[in-house]
């Protein structure tokens, strides 16, 4: 990563260039600004962030800039992280989780195993973060897998997207692979008629007016991480590294709480502006579960390395067993 070193009267100022696809003034951008404010205060202006929010393309574009040294850090989702290591997709297994608490337990356990993989490739994880629960948004109501098969579904073109897109297609879905920055024009022109995203993203990017039906099904949690290259980390004065790590660690729970609190508010705001929630009854839910379980053998190994797929489900089952015992 490239660090801008600007001489001052006493010390050199370290500017960490960090990018995210999150739009300016979104909840994620707001929290990054809080981290920057606290970091500048704690370091007396010696270290600061220069944040690029929603201006440098999609997550693959951001990572390319990181790799060539134009950027030092990134706040990206597992969709982008998967281009560094496929194992990060373990936290995005469809219909594997039913609650925030369950997902958090699994995330914390899996993260400990993912961080060394990213470190081996030159990236230090400052924190993991929630983006929200992914739902389907569509131009026509979608309650069942067959309903979704009638739509032109956006799938991510970054990370390990080829295998993911093929899996969707193998199960009869009509997919269009695009960069996230192309979702809006694709919706406007009818190139796509459905997309997957957390409600906060659908609202922040103003995608939902063009796909005004949201399926009431928590498809998967979308998790992200703030990463910095080891090269950039080493250029931060040693006495300030722990300060940065502590500030990020202290802000992480605040972001998590805000994301969870605002998710329902985002849905309410969209409903007031025309969004319709499509109910998924038990028969439809069973159809989704059957479709997903049929796909698990192909997800395991091709999209998520077998070891991490198994570990994710093991931790989930462990949480459920512990929670069941606690309620007896």
Q: What are these regions, as identified by a protein language model?
A:
Residues 6-9:
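N-terminal signal peptide c-region/cleavage motif recognized by signal peptidases
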Residues 12-102, 113, 118-328:
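N-terminal secretory/targeting leader peptides
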């Amino acid at each position: 990563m490239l660090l801008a070193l600007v001489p001052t009267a006493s010390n050199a100022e370290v500017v960490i260039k960090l990018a995210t696809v999150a739009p300016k003034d979104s909840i994620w951008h707001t929290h990054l600004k809080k981290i920057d404010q606290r970091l500048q205060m704690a370091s007396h202006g010696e270290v600061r962030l220069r944040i690029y929010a929603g201006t440098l393309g999609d997550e693959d574009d951001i990572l390319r800039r990181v790799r060539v040294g134009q950027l030092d850090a990134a706040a990206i989702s597992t969709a982008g992280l998967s281009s560094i290591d496929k194992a990060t997709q373990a936290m995005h297994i469809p219909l594997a989780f039913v609650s925030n608490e369950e997902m958090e337990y699994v995330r914390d356990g899996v993260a400990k195993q993912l961080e060394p993989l990213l470190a081996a490739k030159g990236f230090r994880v400052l924190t993991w973060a929630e983006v929200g629960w992914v739902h389907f948004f569509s131009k026509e109501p979608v309650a069942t897998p067959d309903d979704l098969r009638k739509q032109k579904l956006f799938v991510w073109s970054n990370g390990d997207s080829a295998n993911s897109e093929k899996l969707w297609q193998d199960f009869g879905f009509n997919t269009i692979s695009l960069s996230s920055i192309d979702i809006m024009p694709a919706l406007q022109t009818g190139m796509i008629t459905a997309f997957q995203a957390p409600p906060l993203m659908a609202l922040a990017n103003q995608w939902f007016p063009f796909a005004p039906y949201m399926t009431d099904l928590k498809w998967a949690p979308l998790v992200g991480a703030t990463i910095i290259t080891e090269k950039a980390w080493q250029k931060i004065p040693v006495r300030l590294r722990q300060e940065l790590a502590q500030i990020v660690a202290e802000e992480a729970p605040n972001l998590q709480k805000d994301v969870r609190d605002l998710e329902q508010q985002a849905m309410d705001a969209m409903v007031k502006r025309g969004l319709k929630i499509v109910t998924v009854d038990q028969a439809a839910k069973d159809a989704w579960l059957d479709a997903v379980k049929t796909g698990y053998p192909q997800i395991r190994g091709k999209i998520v390395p077998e070891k991490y797929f198994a570990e994710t489900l093991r931790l989930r089952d462990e949480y459920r067993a512990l929670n069941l015992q606690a309620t007896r």
